[in-house]
Design a protein with these regions (language model features):
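Conserved, well-structured interaction surfaces
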Residues: 46, 89-167, 190, 194-198, ...
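Hydrophobic-face positions in mid-chain alpha helices that act as interaction patches
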Residues: 70, 243-252, 264-402, 464-465, ...
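Long, intrinsically disordered, low-complexity segments
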Residues: 203, 397, 401-402, 444-501
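Membrane-proximal, proline-rich intrinsically disordered regions
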Residues: 21-78, 276, 319, 465, ...
């Protein structure tokens, strides 16, 4: 049989002697590896799996386009004007903001995202195929073997859900049907098979179920908290170093959070609520919470502020050079660092002062997001244009996190799917307490809840690429900041590009 070759970004994991999280992810080399030999060793599986995570962190996927820029531009979140001569990577966001899909720049964005998503899926398929062929026996420990396979299924599901949310039809009461490939191919020579919405969702659910089964009794998160698994050196509590830093991997609770996200997107709010509550209440065998909501401990430290809420991440990507991608795009230097930061609207994504005011309209002034998340940066004419500090790290920092699934989302899903106002108010009070807001006014109707939820998604997940999907699943007609342009069902369906890869 003809051997298939694939170029993988293979990260060589130091099985012993980790000195930092960057050691875990950053010792990497581009090599072309014979796929028939790669999975003959545990190190081969490690490299292939870590290569998947490395690909997700690229700027063409979650490093920028799927989080900070393009997908949030589709939600019309960034303040942009047609009269400004933007740099190309900002201009493309203007076209997305006004939903002009006919522009070459827009089409290039869609092709880039689409191809990179399916390329990342193909790499997960290579790992899954290796297990189907019995190569998993090269991983001696049965639990580690199950975790690696479970992560591959979880990643494949994660990617396919985002393909569906971006390029698929609206999930509820669709009048326009879209078929999409659910990729299980392991070579670029193979043709992708297209599926109807229902067929696609069935495969997505099957992958999530498989990931859950493999991870449930084998993932170290059953025994330890995320914080304990992030300990380094002699403090590591597991024998296999590859099983540490579970917040940066598709762990069991990340898969459950993904499942809750999926069911909420599909309109099954009750099931989404129930799963989200399981994640919220998750504990180790010792009864310790696996993860808790981020608080002032993340946002308000005098040093090493971490605005991207890493402590509450259920799944995130580690990005060693986050400053190099976030600062040129977002600026976002906190006033606590310098009051002289300058923004250039041709180069940076910003808000206007009125938009920022509206974003936090009616919010308690103690809300740590309004206090720490945004910086009132000025342009060369001293005009203020707020920039987001979520991804700010110092230029010399070696730490950076891109959140992909957070506990805050589980709270908002649980609130939206709750059956009583009492439960809604209890959950929302806990959620807001983590933002240093003590509530005195409570929701009196479910309509009030829905109105507030759209505002909360916007405040909480700005620059994380989630707002467009919230609008899409609700088929929202008028987007915040872009009410002059009415959305319709067709505008929520991103045109499928001409090429798969």
């Amino acid at each position: 049989m003809k051997k298939k070759y694939i170029s993988l970004l293979l990260s060589v994991l130091l099985v012993g002697g980790f000195t930092s999280c960057s050691d875990w992810l950053d010792v990497e080399q581009n090599i072309e590896k014979d796929a028939d030999e790669m999975f003959d060793t545990y190190d081969g599986f490690k490299g292939a799996l870590t290569g998947c995570y490395s690909d997700l962190a690229k700027t063409d996927l979650y490093g920028t386009r799927m989080t900070m820029s393009n997908v949030d531009a589709l939600a019309s979140l960034w303040y942009m004007e047609g009269s400004i001569d933007y740099r190309d990577n900002i201009q493309e966001n203007y076209y997305l903001r006004v939903h002009d899909y006919s522009q070459t720049m827009s089409q290039d964005v869609f092709q880039t995202i689409y191809s990179n998503l399916y390329n990342a899926v193909l790499e997960t398929n290579m790992i899954i195929k290796a297990f189907h062929e019995g190569k998993g026996v090269s991983i001696a420990d049965a639990a580690s073997r199950a975790v690696v396979e479970g992560e591959a299924y979880g990643l494949r599901a994660f990617l396919h859900l985002d393909i569906l949310r971006l390029f698929g039809q609206v999930p509820v009461n669709a009048t326009l049907q879209v078929s999409l490939p659910y990729s299980e191919i392991t070579s670029y020579d193979e043709n992708l098979t297209y599926y109807t919405f229902d067929e696609y969702v069935a495969k997505l659910k099957a992958d999530i179920e498989q990931a859950k089964t493999l991870l449930k009794d084998n993932d170290p998160v059953a025994l330890y908290t995320y914080a304990e698994l992030n300990e380094l050196g002699d403090e590591v509590l597991v024998d296999d170093d590859f099983m540490t830093f579970r917040q940066y991997r598709m762990n069991y609770w990340a898969v459950r959070a993904l499942e809750a996200r999926m069911y909420m997107y599909l309109g099954d709010k009750t099931r989404a609520h129930d799963i989200a509550m399981e994640v919220i209440n998750a504990t180790t065998t010792d009864g310790d919470p696996v993860v808790t909501l981020s608080s002032n401990l993340d946002y308000g430290q005098a040093t090493n502020r971490r605005y991207m809420s890493p402590s509450e991440c259920l799944f995130s990507l580690y990005y060693d050079d986050l400053y190099e991608i976030s600062y040129p795009l977002l600026c976002g230097v906190p006033t606590s660092v310098t009051t002289l930061s300058s923004v250039n609207r041709q180069n940076n994504l910003t808000l206007s002062t009125s938009w920022k005011t509206d974003l936090f309209l009616g919010c308690d002034p103690n809300d740590i997001r309004s206090r720490f998340m945004w910086s009132d940066t000025r342009d060369s004419q001293s005009n203020v244009y707020p920039t987001i500090s979520k991804y700010y790290v110092s230029e010399n920092s070696t730490s950076g996190v891109i959140p992909l699934l957070r506990l805050s989302e589980m709270y908002l899903i649980a609130i939206e799917g709750a059956s009583t106002l009492d439960e809604v108010n209890t959950l929302y009070s806990t959620y807001m307490a983590s933002k240093e807001v003590s509530r005195t006014d409570y929701f009196k109707s479910m309509n009030e809840v829905i109105t507030e939820l759209s505002k909360e998604y916007r405040r909480e997940f700005f620059a994380e690429g989630q707002m467009f999907y919230y609008y899409k699943r609700n088929n929202t007609r008028n987007l915040w900041s872009n009410e002059s342009m009415a959305m319709d069902e067709g505008l929520y369906i991103i045109p499928n590009p001409d090429r798969d890869f």
